[in-house]
Amino acid sequence: MISKKTLITRDNFDKLILPIYNPIPFIPIKGKGSRIWDQKGKEYIDFSGGIAVTSLGHCHPILNKTLKNQSKMLWHLSNIFTNEPALRLAKKLLSSSFASRIFFANSGAEANEAAFKLARYYSSKIYNFKKNKIISFYNSFHGRTFFTVSVGGQSKYSNNFGPKPAGIVHASFNDINSVKNLIDHDTCAVVVELIQGEGGVIPANLTFVQALKELCKQYNVLLIFDEIQTGIGRTGKLFYYEYYAITPDILTIAKSLGGGFPISAMLTTNEVASVIAPGIHGTTYGGNPLACAVAESVIDIINTKKVLSGVEKKSKKIISELNIINKRFKLFTEIRGRGLLIGIVLKPNVSRNIHKILNFSLSEGVIFLTAGNNVIRLAPSLIIKELDIIEGMKRFYRALEKYLSRKE
């Protein structure tokens, strides 16, 4: 047993934690805004945002105050009761979206699990039990439960766990003919990320999403938008589907919703929700007062003209800085994404060294993510300061200099 007085080190992870992760060598102990500090006091500028989670940066004072105040009132009740923070949050999310009903959970995987179950349940009740096929897309990612990871289009995450859930097929992203070859009257849902995050920060084409909507209407199929990564202001609108002017039947959100506190939600219409009765689905912690109070404050801050328009401005600044860097080093083939979900596509001869580039970046004090095998992903705070953007890009520049001057 490790006492509180014993120094905690990265080595403790290897001895104590199930090795499903391989954390970077240092341990962060403090964060403020878009900067974090490790045990040795070294400072880093965070462009990872906890994988698009810390939408308002680290330890935002309003979120701190909200959490502290709610912790003095109610922590947990279970869904034998409802609670005021959950109902207030529900009102705000529903009034800002297409939806009329909402279900709260704790993670993106749980929200997607609920969405897939709802789609099958609705179709079995309204049509017939054979209408249960779910169409997803190659390179998509929808969570780590066995159902959601099977729906996801990356077999490396779902292989070797035994028989997979049946009735799941995969089409090629942005290829409507691929969907046409799979969809039929036994299909209950098509689920799509409007930007494939884990798959490489690849946006869905407008014509592709329009055609998906029409196909779903033709076959009485529910259209599910997975906005776990793009939702809650990440792209400069509260929900990314607003850019397409196309509404889904079911929407899932998480990550930015809690600003770092675990919460997710599934939103849907009165029509789809009409088949649900008590006991059909559930959660112990979902919609708890602490999470919902924090998420309400997140929405109050983000769902404003100042913050949402600021996302676009910050995005343009980052992309401008990246273009300057690329003009110097010529390592990128493309910079893509929307708002503050940005993908830097590396040239083929560079992408094999993507982790070396990230390690050089860490040594310079700037944190990035990967997306796929050849993309550096940026998903910083939606309110990251321009000073942090400029300094972060300077550090990235120095990291690339060192990468190019390295000796193998």
Swiss-Prot record:
Coarse class of the protein's main subcellular location: cytoplasm
Binding site for pyridoxal 5'-phosphate: 108-109, 141, 226-229, 284
Cofactor(s) for this UniProt protein: pyridoxal 5'-phosphate
Broad EC category: transferase
Classification via Pfam families: Aminotran_3 (PF00202)
Catalyses which reaction(s): N(2)-acetyl-L-ornithine + 2-oxoglutarate = N-acetyl-L-glutamate 5-semialdehyde + L-glutamate; N-succinyl-(2S,6S)-2,6-diaminopimelate + 2-oxoglutarate = (S)-2-succinylamino-6-oxoheptanedioate + L-glutamate
PROSITE patterns: AA_TRANSFER_CLASS_3
Binding site for N(2)-acetyl-L-ornithine: 144, 283
The EC number(s) this enzyme carries: 2.6.1.11, 2.6.1.17
Subcellular location field: Cytoplasm
Keyword Cytoplasm in record: yes
GO terms for biological process, alphabetical: L-arginine biosynthetic process; lysine biosynthetic process via diaminopimelate
Cofactor binding, note field: Binds 1 pyridoxal phosphate per subunit.
GO cellular component: cytoplasm
Role summary: Involved in both the arginine and lysine biosynthetic pathways.
Stated name of the protein: Acetylornithine/succinyldiaminopimelate aminotransferase
Species for this entry: Buchnera aphidicola subsp. Acyrthosiphon pisum (strain APS)
Name of the coding gene: argD
